[in-house]
């Protein structure tokens, strides 16, 4: 198995534990005058992507955004579970993601638009979990898969 590429960043103390996940939202206005903003907003972090904390460092920082301060952590892009057409659902295949459905009121919307997945983003299908037959709209030929963004 490939070793995960990790990124050093700073997150709120509440999120600073192994396994915690978050979607990077970019800089807040309060970050402009912060002395550790360059680490917090590491150039390798991509807005809208989901990350998982893989290790926590001891250093704690005061933070104008996070109550209780912030800690340095190492993060990696996380695996995302989503629904895609069966025609794209082949293990180890690179795909360009297009959501199956755009109905925000649909019960299955979270599977078609999981946090951290971007439309027209490039992903590798890691695992095909099986058929997805629970589409409230009745769409056929769907699979539930685990994907990871293609490294850039």
Swiss-Prot record:
Similarity comment: Belongs to the UPF0179 family.
Taxonomy, superkingdom: Archaea
InterPro entries, per the entry: UPF0179
HAMAP family (UniProt xref): UPF0179 (MF_00498)
Source species: Methanocorpusculum labreanum (strain ATCC 43576 / DSM 4855 / Z)
Protein name: UPF0179 protein Mlab_1307
PANTHER family attached to this UniProt entry: UPF0179 PROTEIN MJ1627
